[in-house]
């Protein structure tokens, strides 16, 4: 059975979470989206730092998302959708738990599994999200060499990663 099929139940559960539905609806407001971006950057920075410890992104640097997410977050602030003195963005508890978990150390195999879920989720789902959220451009969902990235990451996956 393919890894995609093995994680389908978890994927379906994630898609049915209230925030995921809000994100996909296009009804998310800019402040909510900025909070989302801020938290995504935290998660991606942690994961990409662990991946760097294993050197696994050296051949595919364009898969990195943290800096692109940061640029999107800055764009939200530039649009004045957030007022720094009033709109304090915070790391959500679930993201803090993920950050702590990742920073405890991931094996190379675990890094690939997390990259598959996070980066591919944004690669595929991001196309739909960016069409629905029209108040800004979305750097985080723009992947160069998409076909090559997909092939490279898939070559590192195995069914025992579930």
List PLM regions with ranges:
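Metal- and O2-centered redox machinery and metal/ROS homeostasis
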Residues: 1-162
């Amino acid at each position: 059975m393919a890894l995609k099929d093995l994680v389908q139940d978890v994927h379906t559960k994630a898609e049915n979470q209230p925030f995921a539905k809000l994100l996909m609806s296009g009804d998310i407001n800019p402040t909510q989206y900025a909070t989302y971006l801020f938290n995504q950057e935290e998660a991606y920075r942690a994961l990409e730092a662990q991946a760097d410890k294993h050197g696994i992104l050296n051949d595919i640097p364009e898969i990195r998302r943290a800096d692109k997410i940061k640029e999107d977050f800055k764009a939200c602030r530039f649009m004045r959708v957030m007022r720094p003195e009033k709109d304090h963005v915070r790391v959500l508890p679930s993201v803090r738990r993920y950050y702590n978990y990742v920073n405890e150390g991931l094996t190379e195999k675990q890094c690939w599994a997390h990259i598959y879920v996070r980066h591919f989720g944004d690669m595929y789902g991001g196309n739909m999200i960016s069409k629905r959220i029209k108040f800004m451009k979305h750097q985080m969902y723009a992947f160069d060499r998409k076909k090559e990235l997909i092939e490279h990451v898939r070559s590192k996956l195995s069914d025992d990663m579930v």
